[in-house]
Amino acid sequence: MSGPLQYKWFFESTTPVEGHMHAIARTISTLQTKFQFMEIFETHSYGKVLVLDGRIQSSQHDEFIYHEILVQPGLLAHPKPVRAMVIGGGEGATVREILRHPSITDCLMVDIDGEVVEECKKHLPEMHQGVFDDKRTRVLHEDARAYLRRPRSASTSSWSTCPSRSKRARPACSSPRSSTR
């Protein structure tokens, strides 16, 4: 008989007084980068999971829900999208959704953490489905704020996967001050 003590568990708090537990089938990769602590493991219920600084970013069996909704409404509303930019998105699933549109000729992903992107390329092919090898994909490993301050074409659609606030790295999409509106 299987029981909870036979598994290694991952616990993620969802509120100060509540959380969710996942039984881990196997650990695939753990890595402390300059910017964050990354884990990739496989769970019994959700398949492979990408975790950054203790927060789940994507899980194999349900990531399509988030990534399709993030990308498809904007691209479907556009008459002919040609270029796109993704801020963050290390596992490649946002780029995957963008490249479903044949009119896209160039998709730039700006993700500060190249080590995480490389681990995702290696261990999460179910999520990125080979987009890193697509000639339309370009990847830059730099601070998105610095990149966005440089002049660029105004005709590029952009998406931010906006990671949770980290003590080590502030997301490029966060505001330096809270809005009171």
What are these regions (language model features)?
Residues S2-F10, T33, S58-R181:
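The AdoMet/dcAdoMet-binding core of the Class I SAM-like
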Residues M1-V49:
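N-terminal auxiliary segments of SAM/dcSAM-dependent transferases
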